[in-house]
Amino acid sequence: KFSSFITLFTTCFNLAWQEITYVTEANVNDDRKGFYTQAINYYMRFLGMGVLLLIPVVYVIYPFFINESYSAAKVYVPLYLFATIASVISEFLGEIFTATKMNRYLFWTTVTSGTLNVISVHVLIPIWGVQGASLSLLIGFCVNTVMRLIILRKEISISLDLKFLGFFILLAVVVSMVYIHGAIWSNIISFVIVGVICLFVFKDILLQILQSIKLKKNKKA
């Protein structure tokens, strides 16, 4: 249910993104490198920080939305959410391949990651059960995403915010550990801390929004 919410939201965004990419490609004078670099980095930030905020929220609301007989499944949520995010990002990158007429890469990146997923499922499920299935999904989509990012870096010269990615991975581990081993109050604290971090991560956007609001107020005055 929780991953379906993410998928629904991102599907709507991807439809709009598809239109934007085609318009960008039609305007050949646009800065493709700058446009796609900014779009990819911001998209990863929004999804990454969004899921880190969602995880402690799920911990709190889980008993109210999910029947008590499924309480044991609560531990599987973080890894499955991360797998969903990896899937969404790979789809997002796929739209760029389509818009830039690099469809030839879509097939073999999908086949490679799909093959790896099938292999890892058979290896990990006997060891970790359902958690192994989620992990194999995460591995498959992460490999797909990494391959597509490497290709885009080569073809369009995009540059990734590696500092944020490293920080996100570290924070994701901490938030997941708090979710699995912590109590309700530790997850509430986790939510607050991640929320504060979001203010720093998106400070540039927030400042632009505040400046825009001030300008509108000044014009009305």
Write out the residue ranges for each language-model feature.
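Residue-level recognition of pore/gate-forming positions within transmembrane alpha-helices
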Residues: 4-5, 51, 84, 110-115, ...
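Membrane-proximal transmembrane or re-entrant/amphipathic helices at the cytosolic face
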Residues: 178-221
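Structural signal for membrane-spanning alpha-helices in multi-pass inner-membrane proteins
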Residues: 54, 121, 148, 152, ...
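Interfacial/gating helices of multi-pass transporter permease domains
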Residues: 1-7, 71-75
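Alpha-helical transmembrane segments of multi-pass membrane transport and lipid-handling proteins
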Residues: 13-14, 36-87, 118-122, 126-127
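Membrane-interface junctions at transmembrane-helix termini in multi-pass inner-membrane proteins
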Residues: 81-112, 123, 152-156
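Membrane-interface helix-loop junctions in multi-pass transport and translocation proteins
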Residues: 104, 111-145, 177-192
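Helix-loop junctions and terminal segments of transmembrane helices
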Residues: 7-41, 94-99
